[in-house]
C-alpha cells in the first residue's frame, strides 16, 4: 500500500532537485554575464575617455606597488599598469570578436552549403576542414602568424583559420538535420529559390547552434590571441594585449607579481565567463538532436 506514495515522493524529490539545479545554473549564468559585462563596460569607458592613451606617461618609480596615482602599481618603465591593462583588454577583445565574427560568417556559409547540397560540395568542404582540424590549434595559429608576420591582422587571420573547421562541421550537421524536415522539402518542391530558403528557413532554425559555437570560439580566440602575443607572434609593442602584458611581466615576476597576475586573472575570468555563457546558450537554444548527432 505504500508503493504509490513512495513513488510519488521520489518523483517530487527528483523534480525539486532538478529545479534546484536549474536555479543554481541560472545563478551561475547571471553571475558570468554580470562579471563579463563589467569587464567590457569598464574597458569601453576607459577607451572612450582616453584613459588608454596615457600608457606612455611615467607616474612613479619602476615596479612600484599600488598607490593613488597608480592603483595597481607601475611597470618596469614607471608607467601606471592600469591604463595598459585597459588597453590590453580592449585589444584582446577587439581582435577576438572581429576574428569570431569573420569565422562565424564563413563557417555558416560553408556549413550550410555542405549540409544542404551534400555530394561534391560536402566532400570538398569537409576534407579541407578535416585537414585544418588535424593540426593543434596553437601550432596552426603560430604557422599562419609566422607566414604573415606579427601584428593584429595576422592574429585575426590565425584565429579565423583555427576556428572555422569545428564551426563548419557543427553548422553542417545542424543544416542537414533541418534540411530533411518537411517545410524545407516542400519549399524546394515548390520552387522557392535557394537563397530564400537559406535566409528565411534554414538560418533562423540553426541560429541557436551558431550562437553557441560562436561563444565557444570566442573563448578559444581570447586564449589563442593571448598565446600568440605572449610568444611574440601577435600584437607588438607599443600596443598592448593581455598576452603581451603577461610576457613583459614575466621578467619581473619576483619583484612585481601583479604585472603577471592581474592580466592573467582578467584573461582567465573572461574565458571562464564566456564558456559559462556558452553553456547557457547551449541549454536554451541548441536542439538535443543536434547535440546527439555531434
Where do the PLM segments sit?
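C-terminal transmembrane helix and the adjacent membrane-cytosol boundary/short C-terminal tail
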Residues: 162, 208, 212-216, 257-294
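Glycine-rich helix-loop "coupling/hinge" segments at transmembrane-helix boundaries
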Residues: 133, 144-147, 159, 174-175, ...
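Generic hydrophobic transmembrane alpha-helix motif, especially the helices
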Residues: 71, 75, 115-116, 121-177, ...
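Hydrophobic alpha-helical transmembrane segments of membrane transport/permease proteins
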Residues: 30, 34-77, 232-239
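Transmembrane alpha-helices
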Residues: 90-106, 141, 195-227, 274
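Transmembrane alpha-helical segments of polytopic membrane transport and secretion proteins
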Residues: 1-37, 276-294
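Transmembrane-helix boundary motif in ABC transporter permease subunits
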Residues: 46-49, 95-130, 142
